[in-house]
């Protein structure tokens, strides 16, 4: 994924560092899908950067397709290699200092300036905290597309 990619020109982005094995990612992905549906027409694009347990591209792509089907995801999921620390450092650490949690959502405005980085995700079991986090994500997405 590059800033120069024509698909993302003039669009606000939520870039999600995730994995199909990550329990909090399982809770976050449907929320991101709803944001894509709600704000996509206004120029929001959600992109998942997936780090998988298996570094076998065929197996990882199969897992990603199953994941997309399970949650009805229409946004882009890109396989970025294994969760091996060296691979993760190579892929993202030079662009994102202090990455430490799956999922990490990066909220980027239409001029491609990072507005917020959100690490972790509070799932439905947290009750009011989950609902507050959904409202926070919705407000962030709304601001990105203005």
Give the residues covered by each predicted segment.
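Short pre-active-site segment immediately N-terminal to redox-active cysteine/selenocysteine motifs
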Residues: 11-13, 18-21, 28, 53, ...
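Thiol-/selenol-based redox modules, centered on thioredoxin-like
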Residues: 101-146
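A short beta-strand-turn-helix
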Residues: 1-13, 36-39
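Solvent-exposed loop/turn segments at secondary-structure junctions
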Residues: 19-24, 51-56, 82-85, 114, ...
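Structural microenvironment flanking redox-active thiols in thiol-disulfide oxidoreductases
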Residues: 27-72, 84-93
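Structural micro-motif
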Residues: 72-76, 94-106
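Short amphipathic alpha-helix with an adjacent loop that forms part of the alpha/beta core around
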Residues: 3-8, 88-96
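Hydrophobic beta-strand anchors of alpha/beta hydrolase catalytic cores
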Residues: 14-15, 46, 105
